[in-house]
């Protein structure tokens, strides 16, 4: 067989959210605000659930780790994206791109699994309240969180090298604001059947397992709520579940749209807009949806703002 005649790609150029020069500064300001709000909200949740004695049950333990994951997911993407708004040559090295994809996969898969863990936690809390602290013990909490991170890490070290094992030898322009799977595979000059198959199987397995756990948990939660005799209690419980389900639906809907479709059907410009939701918008909204409507968190936040030392003294 004749030897291949090509120049291997050593760096990529990111097109960003928009290629319009007039929009770079306005977009920089918009996404800077989103990132700052994401940082503030999630760091606030991490701080409150770490130092306040009222927020030391399993629900807030899992919420703290969701905030850590959201913070990591945004930080893997946002700083590079913000920098690229301000420079003309939006380049990223081959290894920097691989590292970013690996970090993104670690956090996004960990978030998928953490949502399933949190759904199970809420199921036990509502359906078996008397046994809640026995079933969801400290040991189980640590085990579930450890498995969540381990699964995210194992997915990242399998999928990311697989994506970068194909040949990139023609265009090096990634039609995206970060190194994502679909735009990278679109640049490959070799057969992408194996990495596409691995990505599809991995995404399908992760999402289906997590979604089944979430749906079964919330189905039983709804049945339990319907048995509540007090109209006010039922209304409050439904309102709380609706908030969580909105966040879960937006997240899973975006992920299904992104990854469970054939590569040939991808519209990369549409994918960029969808990616904004689960890399920046959802991590920004999660602290509000999951906790700021919660009375315990509101009380803890008020006490912390009045006297930051109060929470430490009350532990």
Curated annotation (Swiss-Prot):
Example GO molecular function: G protein-coupled receptor activity
Gene Ontology CC: plasma membrane
Side Extracellular, residues: 1-25, 76-99, 161-197, 259-271
Domain of life: Eukaryota
Cytoplasmic side: 47-54, 121-139, 218-237, 293-315
Topology term for the membrane: Multi-pass membrane protein
Keywords linked to the UniProt accession: Cell membrane, Disulfide bond, G-protein coupled receptor, Glycoprotein, Membrane, Olfaction, Receptor, Sensory transduction, Transducer, Transmembrane, Transmembrane helix
Glycosylation-annotated residues: 5, 265
Gene3D superfamilies: Rhodopsin 7-helix transmembrane proteins (1.20.1070.10)
Subcellular location: Cell membrane
S-S bonds: 97-189
Protein name: Olfactory receptor 8J3
Organism: Homo sapiens (Human)
Organism lineage string: Eukaryota, Metazoa, Chordata, Craniata, Vertebrata
Gene name linked to the record: OR8J3
């Amino acid at each position: 067989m004749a030897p291949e005649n090509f120049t291997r790609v050593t760096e990529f150029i990111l097109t960003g959210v928009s290629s319009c020069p007039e929009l770079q500064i306005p977009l920089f300001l918009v996404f800077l605000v989103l990132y700052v709000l994401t940082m503030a909200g999630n760091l606030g949740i991490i701080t409150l659930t770490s130092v306040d004695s009222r927020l030391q049950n399993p629900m807030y333990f899992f919420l703290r780790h969701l905030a850590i994951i959201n913070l990591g997911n945004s930080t893997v993407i946002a700083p590079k994206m913000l920098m690229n708004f301000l420079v003309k040559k939006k380049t990223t090295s081959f290894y920097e791109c691989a590292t970013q994809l690996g970090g993104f996969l670690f956090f996004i898969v960990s978030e998928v699994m953490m949502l399933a863990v949190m759904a199970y936690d809420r199921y036990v809390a509502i359906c078996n309240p008397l046994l809640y602290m026995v079933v969801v013990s400290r040991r189980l909490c640590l085990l579930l969180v450890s498995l969540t991170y381990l699964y995210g890490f194992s997915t990242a070290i399998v999928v990311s090298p697989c994506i970068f094992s194909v040949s990139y030898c023609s265009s090096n322009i990634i039609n995206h604001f970060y190194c994502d799977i679909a735009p990278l595979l679109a640049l490959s000059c070799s057969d992408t059947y194996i990495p596409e198959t691995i990505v599809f199987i991995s995404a399908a397995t992760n999402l289906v397992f997590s979604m089944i756990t979430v749906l079964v948990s919330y189905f039983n939660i709804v049945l339990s709520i319907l048995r509540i005799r007090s109209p006010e209690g039922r209304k409050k419980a439904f309102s709380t579940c609706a908030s969580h389900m909105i966040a879960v639906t937006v997240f899973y809907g975006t992920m299904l749209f992104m990854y469970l479709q054939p590569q040939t059907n991808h519209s990369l410009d549409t994918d960029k807009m969808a990616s904004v939701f689960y890399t920046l918008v959802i991590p920004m909204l999660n602290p509000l949806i999951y906790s700021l409507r919660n009375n315990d968190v509101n009380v803890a936040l008020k006490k912390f703002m009045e006297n930051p030392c109060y929470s430490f003294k009350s532990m």
